[in-house]
UniProtKB/Swiss-Prot annotation:
Gene: rnhB
UniProt binding sites for a divalent metal cation: D16, E17, D108
Record-linked InterPro entries: RNase_HII (IPR022898), RNase_HII/HIII (IPR001352), RNase_HII/HIII_dom (IPR024567), RNaseH-like_sf (IPR012337), RNaseH_sf (IPR036397)
Protein name: Ribonuclease HII
Keywords: Cytoplasm, Endonuclease, Hydrolase, Manganese, Metal-binding, Nuclease
Cofactor(s), by name: Mn(2+); Mg(2+)
Family: Belongs to the RNase HII family.
Length: 198
């Protein structure tokens, strides 16, 4: 992996998203500005960490970061805009919510939303940039908790296990029970469950 070279600036925010692929729930984004004086050991892509480690880092990031913020786009917005544009909107909301305005924003992936400050897309940024790793952890722990809460309301779908992703079990239950109000109606499997496509 090529080492990431940071821009020559002080206040750098990292941004990442969780939940582009699931059939249910919001896409959740986070923006984090870390404090160089309070380093956090063990930051990595949230998907590569155990749930226990993610939860511990989640608390440490919230305590030590100079600023952090969540952004989201709800299923209705995803259906109206499409998942890419909804994700960009959620990222804009996360950056706008920071209590400190960053000088530079590093975004995980290959494209940036329109922002009022300089930004750069970093491919595999969640493994290469500490601020993006921190954002991925904040976003994933938040969205996983939302799926666990949704699981209590709709236990038959197994949301706590698959987090809304289109697993065989989820697709089976979607076919059996139909979609909830939280499902994304523009996604193919949900359309099929509604009888909108063959």
């Amino acid at each position: 992996m090529i080492e990431f070279v940071y821009p020559h600036t002080h206040l750098v925010a990292g941004v990442d998203e969780v939940g582009r692929g699931p059939l249910v729930g919001a896409v959740v984004t986070a923006a984090v500005i870390l404090d160089p004086a309070r380093p956090i050991v063990g930051l990595n892509d949230s998907k590569k960490l155990s749930e226990k480690r993610r939860l511990a880092l989640f608390d440490e990031i919230k305590e030590k970061a100079l600023a952090w913020s969540l952004g989201r786009a709800e299923p209705e917005e995803i259906d109206e805009l499409n998942i890419l544009h909804a994700t960009m909107l959620a990222m804009q909301r996360a950056v706008a919510g920071l209590k400190i305005v960053p000088e530079y924003v590093l975004i995980d992936g290959n494209r940036c939303p329109a922002l009022p400050m300089r930004s750069l897309a970093v491919v595999k940024g969640d493994s290469r940039v500490a601020e993006i790793s921190a954002a991925s952890i904040i976003a994933k722990v938040t969205r996983d908790a939302e799926m666990a809460a949704l699981d209590l309301s709709y236990p038959q779908y197994g949301f706590a296990q698959h987090k809304g992703y289109p697993t065989a079990f989820h697709l089976e239950k979607l076919s059996e029970h139909g979609p909830t109000e939280h499902h994304r109606r523009s996604f193919g499997p949900v359309k099929r469950a509604l009888g909108l496509v063959c």
